């Protein structure tokens, strides 16, 4: 009985805030992603970055609004919350017709403009993103839209580091079926990248190039048709990595995903059930 009461209390705690703050657009969502993985040496039941998310927004008047996002990573294979730096997203911001300003741990300008064209994997990608941060902690970001041109910039200011650890500017431009992205980052090791994507006769093609000042260059290309997706990524310090993925939607937010990857030495793979809510 006590366990049932606790479960009911937890469920009520999740639902009640959304109902009480409906005027502020509170929403609870997330994704659970669990599969059976072959690591190259062994088989295991593994989590694939499951998460629980809380979002809210509030109308400030004059076309302005405030918004926030809390996201917690969950290890669905072990039934635990995963802690540590930049496990998921956590930010607060203000937006209007002029654009948006946000602070916290958020998707970086480098990933939004270039990295996302290179790495579209569910688990095994990223070799070509030599100097691309995915989620960036201790960051402030400004973005705006000028017609078909999206401009964004961010700065990372971590405790104990330099006053400005990284400063990044980037942009996205779309014309017809072609999308282009570019980024430049000033850091201890400067970074630049370019990327593009287009659709030809139902086949989606994308890719990009990254270069680290005094370090590695890397690139990746990928193609998709229907639920099938193929990717090749490489950089100066590693062999090429080939990854293939197939996703089958089951309805109701559920999806079956099979992904296999080979880095020239080992083959890894995961068969995963994902459900978004």
Residue map of PLM features:
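Outer-membrane beta-barrel proteins
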Residues: 1-277
């Amino acid at each position: 009985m006590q366990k049932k009461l606790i479960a009911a209390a937890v469920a009520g705690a999740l639902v009640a805030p959304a109902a009480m703050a409906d005027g502020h657009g509170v929403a609870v969502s997330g994704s659970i992603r669990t599969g059976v993985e072959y690591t190259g040496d062994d088989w295991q039941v593994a989590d694939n970055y499951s998460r629980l998310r809380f979002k809210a927004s509030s109308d400030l008047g004059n076309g302005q609004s405030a918004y926030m996002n809390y996201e917690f990573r969950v290890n669905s294979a072990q039934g635990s919350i995963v802690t540590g730096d930049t496990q998921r997203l956590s930010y607060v911001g203000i937006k209007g017709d002029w654009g948006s300003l946000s602070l916290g741990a958020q998707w970086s300008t480098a990933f939004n403009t270039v990295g996302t064209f290179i790495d579209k994997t569910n688990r095994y990608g990223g070799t070509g993103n030599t100097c691309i941060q995915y989620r960036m902690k201790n960051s402030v970001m400004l973005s705006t839209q000028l017609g078909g041109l999206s401009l964004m910039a961010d700065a990372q200011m971590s405790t104990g580091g330099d006053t400005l650890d990284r400063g990044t500017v980037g942009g996205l431009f779309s014309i017809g079926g072609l999308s282009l992205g570019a980024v430049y980052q000033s850091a201890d090791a400067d970074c630049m990248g370019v990327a593009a994507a287009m659709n030809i006769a139902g086949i989606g093609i994308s890719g990009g190039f990254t270069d680290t000042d005094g370090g590695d260059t890397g690139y990746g290309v990928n193609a998709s048709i229907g639920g099938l997706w193929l990717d090749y990524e490489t950089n100066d310090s590693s062999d090429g990595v080939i990854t293939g993925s197939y996703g089958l939607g089951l309805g109701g937010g559920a999806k079956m995903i099979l992904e296999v990857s080979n880095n020239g030495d080992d083959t890894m793979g995961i068969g995963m059930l994902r459900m978004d809510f």
